[in-house]
Amino acid sequence: MERTCLAVILAAGDSTRMKSSKSKVLHPVAGRPMIAHVVEAVASAGISSVALVVGRDAEEVAKAASIAGVGIEACLQKERLGTGHAVLAAREAIAKGYDDILVTYGDVPLQTDGPLKAARQGLADGSDIVVIGFHTDRPTGYGRLLVKDGELIAIREEKDATDAERTVTWCNSGLMAINGRKALDLLQRIGNANAKGEFYLTDLVEIARSLGGRVTAVDAPEIEMTGCNTRAELAVIERFWQERRRHQLMLSGVTMIAPETVFLSYDTVIGQDALIEPNVVFGPGAVIDSGAVIHAFSHIEGAHVSQGATVGPFARLRPGADLGNGSKVGNFCEVKNGRIGEGAKVNHLTYIGDAVIGAGSNIGAGTITCNYDGVNKSETVIGENAFIGSNSSLVAPVTIGDGAYIASGSVITADVPADALALGRARQEIKPGRASLLRERALATKAAKKAKG
């Protein structure tokens, strides 16, 4: 579509029903502020210019809305005098002369580009106003879209509707597109002669028709038009978002054994033929390649799992974790800023932080990379095909050469050459009969305490 477009996103509400110390549009859905989801939808509709109408937490909202490729102009709404007044807070941006003006809301994070594109197409086809509506089997409380001969003749609010009009199930979402060349003139004609003394954007339908303009409506899925005002509604939106994204991934070839227990982030990438077991949580920045297996109760954030690698169960991958092809991070392991080479194994009860592990190496149970001295982080480097015995502590900075062996229970503080065996533990001593003496002494002490009372 060659037409220019400005999206006006209304995000200046006081968010009183959210009962929060911050604006509701800053609350996350799938690990991302809901306002950013709205900007992403706008960008997907081919719109690169946004007038963001802000009020509460203006700077934070503008920052959260910033995504690559979209120019954001923040417009402060000092008073809350209705939706029509809110759009006019972006007067200067609108006056720049766009073909289309698209009005949407910062608290509707499930919207996608489809209805937005359809509304813009309606303008291209000659409409002056295009309202986005949705069909619902629960229309009570919504304004009804009344259509005749293909044109929208009115938006009838519930309190003003006749019994016949209340049977209409096509409802107003609040989103609309406006002919950019006529937008300012139409918006400035909105009056406030109503009980609340506010300026309502919906009045544009009547105004445009009174001037001989054409007004139409397009449809959107009800779920996409779900707004968020309370914590309960936020939970519903999160559920809807997760269900939609899980379904998309499964259709793309990802296996989820119990999808309702898997939680994704806005940018989670999972390749074809990956297997995700129950109760897995993906934080932002997780990339799972094809054929990888994520076992149950794992948490992955800011990490990359390569083809054929396995994670978990009960594993945690933190930012900077990078697992090579066919590698393994097993149960009760944590990896942070660590690269696990191809085919390397970190099977259980291990912490790998600020480390590089070469291909084919084996890290025994209970191994710890001691990467922090209380002030600075240091790196541990383990070569290829090395063997780290169980319950070893590798005190960084330290390098273990290719093919080296570390004996179980060792504390390694110095570099170990390739193919060397390193032992860093006290020599075992055996004292025959000593256990019996110790046991007798302990029992005597216990009896003496009991006798005293």
Curated annotation (Swiss-Prot):
Major site of localization recorded for this protein: cytoplasm
The ranges of region (N-acetyltransferase) come to 253-453
Cite the InterPro entries for this sequence.
Answer: Bifunctional_GlmU (IPR005882), GlmU-like (IPR050065), GlmU_C_LbH (IPR038009), Hexapep (IPR001451), Hexapep_transf_CS (IPR018357), MobA-like_NTP_Trfase (IPR025877), Nucleotide-diphossugar_trans (IPR029044), Trimer_LpxA-like_sf (IPR011004)
Q: Which Gene3D superfamilies match?
A: Hexapeptide repeat proteins (2.160.10.10), Spore Coat Polysaccharide Biosynthesis Protein SpsA, Chain A (3.90.550.10)
Which residues are noted in the entry as UDP-N-acetyl-alpha-D-glucosamine-binding? 10-13, 24, 77, 82-83, 105-107, 143, 157, 172, 229, 318, 336, 351, 362
Q: Which residues bind acetyl-CoA?
A: A365, N371, Y372, S390, S408, R425
Q: Report any one BP term from Gene Ontology.
A: cell wall organization
- Cross-referenced Pfam families: Hexapep, NTP_transf_3
Q: Where does Mg(2+) bind?
A: D107, N229
Q: Which cofactor does this sequence's record say it needs? A: Mg(2+)
Q: Segment Pyrophosphorylase: which positions?
A: 1-231
Enzyme Commission code(s) on record? 2.7.7.23, 2.3.1.157
Its cellular-component GO annotations read: cytoplasm; membrane
Show the catalytic activity. alpha-D-glucosamine 1-phosphate + acetyl-CoA = N-acetyl-alpha-D-glucosamine 1-phosphate + CoA + H(+); N-acetyl-alpha-D-glucosamine 1-phosphate + UTP + H(+) = UDP-N-acetyl-alpha-D-glucosamine + diphosphate
Record note on cofactor: Binds 1 Mg(2+) ion per subunit.
Q: Name one GO molecular function term.
A: magnesium ion binding
Top class in the EC scheme: transferase
Question: Into which family does the record put it?
Answer: In the N-terminal section; belongs to the N-acetylglucosamine-1-phosphate uridyltransferase family. In the C-terminal section; belongs to the transferase hexapeptide repeat family.
The annotated subunit structure for this chain is: Homotrimer.
Question: What is the documented function of this protein?
Answer: Catalyzes the last two sequential reactions in the de novo biosynthetic pathway for UDP-N-acetylglucosamine (UDP-GlcNAc). The C-terminal domain catalyzes the transfer of acetyl group from acetyl coenzyme A to glucosamine-1-phosphate (GlcN-1-P) to produce N-acetylglucosamine-1-phosphate (GlcNAc-1-P), which is converted into UDP-GlcNAc by the transfer of uridine 5-monophosphate (from uridine 5-triphosphate), a reaction catalyzed by the N-terminal domain.
Q: What is this protein called?
A: Bifunctional protein GlmU
